[in-house]
Amino acid sequence: KLEIIEVADEKTPDNASETVETNIKNKEAERLLKYIRDDAYLITLEIKGKQLTSEELAQKIDTLGVQGTSHIIFVIGGSLGLGEEVLKRSNYALSFSKMTFPHQLMRVILLEQIYRSYRINCGEPYHK
């Protein structure tokens, strides 16, 4: 079952200081963490995360399932990134690129890769 939950970004003032940006990320993190189950495997999308091929992501998802993980949560950060508490809670940091993308576009890319992973794991030809 796939469920998409969107948590609104905090408004960021122009020329916000680092302290203000940290406070904003912390507020967003607090809201995000309310949706993350204790037994879930949390994958955060981060520029500094590990880059995987589609096949490697499929293998990661398959391995989690074999290990008995029934809830996998992917988190895409807002325009400022993810707050420290979400990063601490993360089980795995994943990167699709060293570039920055709008989070709405990243959602489409992530959903396509999740779909592709399941097709790969089912031995279907979609990933070619």
Where are the model-predicted features located?
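Conserved beta-strand segments of alpha/beta enzyme cores
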Residues: 1-3, 92
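S-adenosyl-L-methionine/SAH cofactor-binding core of RNA-modifying enzymes
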Residues: 3-70
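Switch/connector loops and helix/strand junctions flanking conserved nucleotide-binding motifs
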Residues: 13-14, 82-85
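Rossmann-fold NAD(P)-binding glycine/threonine-rich loop
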Residues: 77
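Structured adenosyl-cofactor binding patch, chiefly the S-adenosyl-L-methionine
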Residues: 84-128
